[in-house]
Regions:
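N-terminal binding-site loop/beta-alpha segment at the start of enzyme catalytic domains
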Residues: 1-69, 83, 183-186
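Short, acidic/polar
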Residues: 23-36, 79-94, 110-112, 137-141, ...
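Conserved, mostly hydrophobic/aromatic
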Residues: 18, 35, 43, 55, ...
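Alpha-helical scaffolding within the catalytic cores
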Residues: 2-5, 53, 59, 85-89, ...
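CE4/NodB-like, metal-dependent polysaccharide N-deacetylase domain
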Residues: 82-103, 119-123
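A structural motif
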Residues: 40, 95-98, 126, 150
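A short, structured active-site edge motif that brings together acidic residues
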Residues: 66-79, 99-106, 133
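Beta/alpha (TIM)-barrel catalytic core signal, keyed to glycine-rich beta->alpha loops juxtaposed to Asp/Glu
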Residues: 105-188
């Protein structure tokens, strides 16, 4: 059994998961099936990865009950102003809720995208709200203007890099850090 963390809204999130960045749809589907068979219970995807539908197929093929799987995905910046963007991810994933949905980048009208997440959270379509790759003035703007503080930030974090300023700015609202490149990457 994998260890979980508790988010500030009491949602349980697995400590370890598998990401589907740079996977083709076929690779993502099989990776999800294999990861779930090995005991992983968190799967991360994004609209920009263009494999949400494949992740949903992998979840269904796995035979693991949906309520035992934690799915996170991200709204891409070009979709922040698009009506129905959360619902499109729900449809592609083949699920009636998403455990954690992120704003993928602090670009464009990211506050419009964040407001969509707040609305979806209130409607029960998503269980937690996340931000990805935020720091500095854009992070400050988001924290100043949002109604619901983010539950998770996904950011680069590993033994060679730790953004203490961003982590400290989010600590008062109980925001958890989710690392991408948690072990670093090939150029270190």
């Amino acid at each position: 059994m994998m260890m979980n963390f508790t988010l500030s809204n009491q949602v349980q999130i697995p400590a370890v998961g598998i990401g589907t960045f740079m996977m083709t749809p076929d690779q993502a589907e099989q990776a999800v099936v294999d990861a779930l068979a090995c005991g992983y219970r968190m799967i991360d995807t994004a609209q920009a990865y263009m494999n949400e539908r494949a992740v949903g197929r992998g979840v269904k093929r796995s035979g693991v009950a949906r309520e035992d799987i934690f799915i996170s995905t991200k709204i891409w910046a070009s979709q922040y102003l698009t009506e129905g963007t959360v619902e499109k991810s729900l449809e592609l994933l083949g699920t009636d809720y998403i455990d954690l949905m992120f704003i993928h980048q602090p670009a464009g009208d990211f506050m419009a995208g964040y407001r969509k997440l707040e609305k979806a959270y209130k409607e029960g379509k998503i269980k937690a709200i996340g931000i990805s790759n935020f720091q500095g003035e854009k992070l400050k703007k988001l924290l100043d203007e949002c109604e619901i503080k983010p539950h998770v930030i996904q950011m680069e974090a590993h033994p060679y890099y730790r953004d203490e300023e961003t982590i400290s700015a989010l600590a008062p609202c109980g925001c958890r850090v989710m690392a991408w490149y948690p072990l670093g990457h090939g150029d270190h």
